[in-house]
Design a protein with these regions (language model features):
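Conserved catalytic core of the tyrosine transesterase superfamily
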Residues: 1-165
C-alpha cells in the first residue's frame, strides 16, 4: 500500500472510547475523520467555525481550503463530532482555535502539524500498532473515504464524497 494507512471503522470506535476523557484528542479524531481536511486546514478551525454566536453547535462546517485555494466547502458534522464539540468547545471564545496548542497558552496559537502528527502516532501506539510510521495526520484524512469504500465497494460514492477535496 502506498502512502499512509487509513484507520478502520473499528479502530476509530476504539479510539473514541480511549480518548473520551481527552478533549483535544477527542476533538481531533472526530472532527478530523468527519471533515477529511488536510491537517493545515483542520488545525486552523476556529470556535466560530463550529459554534454559532448563540452557542449552538453547527451541523456543518464552512471551510476554505488553504493549500488549493478552492471555494468554500460546506462539510457536515456527525453526531459524534457534535457531541464532543458540545462537551468541550461551547462557551469558548469564538476567536480561539478549536485545537489550541498547550505549548503556547498565552499566544493562543493552534496546534502545530508536528504536534498533531505526534498525537496520531500516540493513538496508534494505544491501539497496539507496532509500526506507527505507517500512520500520520493524512491517515485521519483518508479514514472516512476508506470506511465508505469498505462498506460499499463503490468508487463512485467515494468520489462524490471526496470530489471537493
Amino acid at each position: 500500500m502506498r502512502g499512509k494507512k487509513p484507520l478502520s471503522e473499528n479502530e476509530v470506535k476504539s479510539l473514541r472510547k480511549l480518548l473520551e476523557d481527552k478533549p483535544l484528542h477527542s476533538l481531533l479524531l472526530n472532527i478530523g475523520v468527519d471533515t477529511m481536511l488536510r491537517g493545515s486546514d483542520l488545525l486552523n478551525l476556529k470556535v466560530s467555525d463550529v459554534v454559532t454566536e448563540s452557542g449552538k453547535v453547527k451541523t456543518e462546517v464552512r471551510v476554505k481550503m488553504m493549500k488549493t485555494k478552492k471555494n468554500t466547502l460546506l462539510i457536515p458534522l456527525s453526531p459524534n463530532s457534535i457531541k464532543v464539540i458540545k462537551k468541550h468547545i461551547v462557551g469558548n471564545n469564538p476567536d480561539d482555535f478549536v485545537f489550541r496548542s498547550s505549548f503556547s497558552p498565552f499566544t493562543k496559537k493552534p496546534l502545530s502539524i508536528f504536534q498533531y502528527s505526534r498525537i496520531v502516532k500516540k493513538w496508534m501506539t494505544m491501539l497496539g500498532k507496532e509500526n506507527v510510521s505507517e500512520y500520520s495526520t493524512h491517515s485521519i484524512r483518508k479514514t472516512k473515504s476508506s470506511v465508505i469504500y469498505q462498506k460499499t465497494q463503490n468508487v463512485e460514492i467515494v468520489s462524490k464524497v471526496t470530489l471537493s477535496f
